[in-house]
């Protein structure tokens, strides 16, 4: 078995991307395979593990951490955001949790505690970059979050979660933010004022890197 055959013998999340990138499979065949991601394998498994309030929880870990990284995993599988099960999962997450700060600790908490919905983000650019990318992928692009990130760009062109204590950008934070901004820009198109501002900010961020 060669490497391509090995990838094609994997679960749908891997197989459809291997078909798209490494074979001559038709777009229809690739789309049909991609549609299976939310129905079987790890994509379906992660959807099934979502709790009633929209969170994914892991013992000993903050709710925001396990939820954010599960969402990033789902995006990496290429799960179809138009599938009913995916749309329901995103609606639960959006309705059931809020970002807020209690006792100097940001966390995802019940909606009655107030704060931002998941896709509106919190205060750290590295987290918000990932959150912005997720909102763009799952059909909930948040302009308020994009504008917040634009306002937090440092003089050297990048971003840093430790700003304003540090005036020097971080590669990690900058990459997280740039990934979010480009995903948002692709989701909304290039004709809007905010998309033009994003394009300019991205160029500065890329020059910093």
Which residues does each PLM region occupy?
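Preference for long, amphipathic alpha-helical scaffolds in soluble/luminal domains
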Residues: 1-209
